């Protein structure tokens, strides 16, 4: 592969912060990309963390309007809820994030996109399939599926490499928030 540049869906959490360093060690030039879907996170701090960890660039994009108009409202109108109670909040955001990543990858001349999904859930499928449909020329790299680390291993890796993350062995998981989680 001649172009080793990729765009990483960056949340600022443990998986994707460790992924920046891991991908760099594998020879990738990492561009961190965060999409604001209405979460109550300090996006400037997330962008700064990506750069501190080693991303060559870090972008934050506002995806709130397309998320609401193209994903949330149509799904609510269709009654798309899980167990008759929960909107498919996280699931709805993944295709939009992937589509926006494809745009950034093309603009930046990247040959791949990457995400921090594990091999256990459906999020990986949403990223992988959306990318394959919109940009079959782009490789999809999934470090968490490849590296064989569990959460404690990731925390140890982060500590060893001086990566500051909002996770500890006592509280290793983060949660996902976006506009579809608000009460309407």
Language model features with spans:
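Conserved small/polar residues in nucleotide/adenosyl-binding loops
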Residues: 182-184
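Short linear loop/turn motifs
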Residues: 167-180
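ATP-dependent adenylation/nucleotidyltransferase module used to activate substrates
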Residues: 1-166
């Amino acid at each position: 592969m001649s172009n080793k540049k990729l765009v990483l869906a960056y949340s600022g959490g443990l998986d994707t912060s460790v992924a920046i360093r891991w991908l760099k060690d594998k020879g990738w030039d990492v561009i961190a990309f965060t999409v604001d879907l209405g979460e109550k996170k300090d996006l400037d701090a997330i962008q700064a963390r990506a750069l501190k960890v080693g991303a060559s660039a870090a972008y934050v994009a506002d995806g709130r309007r397309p998320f609401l108009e193209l994903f949330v409202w149509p799904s609510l109108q269709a009654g798309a809820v899980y167990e008759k109670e929960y909107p498919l909040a996280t699931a709805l955001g993944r295709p939009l994030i992937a589509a926006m990543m494809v745009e950034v990858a093309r603009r930046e001349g990247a040959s791949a996109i990457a995400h921090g999904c594990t091999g256990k859930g459906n999020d990986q499928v949403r990223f992988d399939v959306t990318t394959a449909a919109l940009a079959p020329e782009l490789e999809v790299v999934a470090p968490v599926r490849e590296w064989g680390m569990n959460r404690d291993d990731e925390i140890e890796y982060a500590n060893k490499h001086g990566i500051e993350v909002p996770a500890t062995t006592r509280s290793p998981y983060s949660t996902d928030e976006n506009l579809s989680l608000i009460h309407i």
